[in-house]
Swiss-Prot record:
Protein name: Glutamyl-tRNA reductase
Record remark: domains: Possesses an unusual extended V-shaped dimeric structure with each monomer consisting of three distinct domains arranged along a curved 'spinal' alpha-helix. The N-terminal catalytic domain specifically recognizes the glutamate moiety of the substrate. The second domain is the NADPH-binding domain, and the third C-terminal domain is responsible for dimerization.
Catalytic activity: (S)-4-amino-5-oxopentanoate + tRNA(Glu) + NADP(+) = L-glutamyl-tRNA(Glu) + NADPH + H(+)
Residue positions binding substrate: 38-41, 82, 87-89, 93
Residues at the active site: 39
Top EC class, one word: oxidoreductase
One GO process term, biological-process aspect: protoporphyrinogen IX biosynthetic process from glutamate
Known partners and oligomeric status: Homodimer.
UniProt entry keywords in alphabetical sequence: NADP, Oxidoreductase, Porphyrin biosynthesis
More details: During catalysis, the active site Cys acts as a nucleophile attacking the alpha-carbonyl group of tRNA-bound glutamate with the formation of a thioester intermediate between enzyme and glutamate, and the concomitant release of tRNA(Glu). The thioester intermediate is finally reduced by direct hydride transfer from NADPH, to form the product GSA.
Organism the protein comes from: Methanococcus aeolicus (strain ATCC BAA-1280 / DSM 17508 / OCM 812 / Nankai-3)
Annotated metabolic or biological route of this protein: Porphyrin-containing compound metabolism; protoporphyrin-IX biosynthesis; 5-aminolevulinate from L-glutamyl-tRNA(Glu): step 1/2
Length: 383
């Protein structure tokens, strides 16, 4: 397998945005692959036999090959490569990415085997270790960041968005001593649904400016393709406001930082929270690594078996094509009056000789030992 990857370790989130692919356009161009894109990572997994049309398209990405690429996926599914170590969302993201590629008929049996094992490994890790206990999502990390920087007691909080990440933010907020929670979303019904779970209030998206004005902390997590909050929208806002933008692409434009009463935090700032999170989970990492190694060993055997099955399938196809070709020659000879017994004798000899000659032509010093062992076993098992 071949992997091209870029994530929060080597790029700021704003830079990652520029590297993101339009999924539909990507899959029109490439086959035999799975594209995994989250708020802080972009990873493209190619089948070992895939043809990469434009290698320059991945010039900004780190390239990882073979077993290292496979192990990376298992570690990612287990939450070890996440900014928030042990977070659960990555399993669903990997599962959804694989499902989309499969629906588009872009995966292979080889990739399917690896991705299913990665998902299984991630689930096993969380069921058998404590790697995902405590603050283990981007949403909960954003709330923790707000608590550390400005405090949450008696604050009014505005959550912009009502999707998966916004819901994680909401879940983390429920436990805090907050004065009020407000939810705004482009689809008002979704905002209303989330607000109801929080005993909060929903506001229409066209009233977002007013909602910002009346809240102390604004956490943005929409799926908008472009910034929805900029300097112009905030220039008349009164009072000190803290904005935490955990969307990707970003919801808040950088120009808001020019306003003296606005403090902006982004996903990059969550690294402070992630470092504390890592300390709490350090003792669990060896247990996770052990499970990964065990599952990787099982996967290696599965892939070896898969490779053998493909080899047998290809060899069977080769023999069948050879049989048909020689049989047609034999049938023509019989139709032209040749003795069937003589023809069958000739057919069997030509067929056997052709098998041997084709076989001998591809043998070299590197393969002779393996072939010798196979032939010896065949002779021992001969009928």
């Amino acid at each position: 397998m071949l992997l091209f990857r870029a994530d929060y370790n080597n790029y700021a989130v704003s830079e990652l945005q520029k590297l993101r692919f339009d999924e539909d356009e990507f899959y029109k161009k490439y086959d035999n692959c799975v594209l995994v894109q989250t708020c802080n990572r972009i990873e493209i997994y190619f089948d070992k036999n895939a043809k990469i049309i434009d290698i320059n398209e991945f010039a900004e990405f780190e390239m990882i090959k073979s077993n290292n690429a496979i192990k990376h996926l298992l570690r990612t599914a287990s939450g070890l490569n996440s900014m928030i170590v042990g977070e659960d969302q990555i399993i669903g993201q990997i599962k959804n990415s694989h499902r989309k590629a499969k629906e588009l008929k872009k995966t292979t049996k080889y990739l399917d085997t690896i991705f299913l094992k990665a998902i299984h490994t991630g689930q096993k890790v969380r069921n058998n270790t404590k790697i995902n206990k405590g603050c283990v999502s981007i949403g909960s990390a954003a709330v923790q960041l707000a608590e550390k920087t400005v405090g949450l007691n008696n604050k009014n909080i505005l959550v912009v968005g009502a999707g998966e990440i916004a819901t994680l933010v909401a879940k983390a907020l429920i436990e805090k001593n907050i004065r009020a929670i407000v939810v705004s979303n482009r689809t008002y019904e979704r905002a209303e649904l989330l607000a109801k779970k929080l005993n909060g209030m929903a506001v229409h998206f066209d009233k977002l400016g007013e909602a910002i004005n009346y809240n102390d902390i604004i956490i943005c997590a929409t799926g908008a393709p472009h910034a929805i909050i900029d300097k112009d929208r905030l220039k008349n806002i009164k009072g000190y406001k803290v904005l935490i933008d955990i969307a990707n692409p970003r919801d808040v434009s950088d120009d808001v930082m020019e306003l003296p009463n606005i403090k902006l935090y982004t996903i990059d700032d969550l690294k402070m929270v992630s470092e504390e999170n890592l300390k709490k989970r350090k003792d669990e990492i060896p247990r996770v690594e052990k499970i990964i190694e065990e599952e990787l060993s099982v996967l290696t055997k599965q892939l070896r078996k898969l490779k053998f099955e493909n080899t047998i399938k290809n060899y069977d196809l080769y023999i069948e094509n050879l049989r048909k070709r020689e049989m047609n020659k034999a049938l023509n000879m019989i139709e032209n009056g040749k003795d069937p017994t003589v023809v069958l004798e000739k057919f069997s000899k030509v067929f056997a000789n052709k098998l041997i000659s084709d076989f001998v032509n591809i043998v070299n010093d590197d393969t002779i030992g393996d072939i010798e062992r196979v032939v010896n076993k065949l002779n021992k098992n001969k009928i």
